[in-house]
From Swiss-Prot:
Domain of life: Bacteria
Protein name: Protoheme IX farnesyltransferase
Pathway where it operates: Porphyrin-containing compound metabolism; heme O biosynthesis; heme O from protoheme: step 1/1
Source organism phylogeny: Bacteria, Pseudomonadati, Pseudomonadota, Gammaproteobacteria, Enterobacterales
Any single GO BP term: heme O biosynthetic process
Amino acid sequence: MIKQYLQVTKPGIIFGNLISVIGGFLLASKGVIDYPLFISTLLGVSLVVASGCVFNNYIDRDIDRIMERTKNRVLVKGLIDPKISLIYASILGIAGIVLLYAAANALAMQLAIIGFVVYVGVYSLYMKRKSVYGTLIGSLSGAAPPVIGYCAVTGQFDTGALILLLIFSLWQMPHSYAIAIFRFKDYQAANIPVLPVIKGISVAKNHIILYILAFMIATLMLAISGYAGYKYLVVAAAVSVWWLGMALSGYKTDNDRIWARKLFIFSIVAITSLSVMMSIDPHVPSEAFLTYVR
């Protein structure tokens, strides 16, 4: 039973989000780490993300039955009572929000609530099923964890937080489109209006290129604005150029599914590399680059 309650929280998604939280937190810490705050932030974000995933599993039960990759999820197979899952999700979410408020600050809590509402209330309940722009809306919630980590330290939404929001939002788009391409039949069968299904894979490839170019600019801005150092800059430039090259190769591929899967895998390598480098190579920016929103 414990295994099912763990699975419904999507541990893989929680782990991926924690890597970005660590990146944002350590970037803001500038080498001076408040360990109790660090642990509390990781736990708080984990609980909120877990809550969102459980709610998402509850909402998506009907379409999860249709899709090959989701047909064996806990709620689809009836291993947990749906009503119990709602209570479970609520407890997780409330615990995470309270912890962020008590151990971090009100801004971190507010960002967590906004990310949660966008993911569950806007994306999962409506946009995912009704609009080709659902991925764009979902990308905003996906970018919340690193910003929460950053603001847990700073207590303010400044230029650094804005750049992090841009980096992780822009990264989500080609990452998600790649999934939609190599899982094309799943999304088509479930009538989920993702861009590759609605506009075609060729159009999706064009969008992927544009988003990676924008992602590249955003990643470099973190160093140009003085928030990260030259080591970060070199890695950011390298992974962005490589990712762009992989995306461009999609115009010549004979197998879109294999190409998209490779692009998806490298997207994880890219964002993990950036999270690591911003963690170990932070800089203190000039005041000229700071825009405070307290």
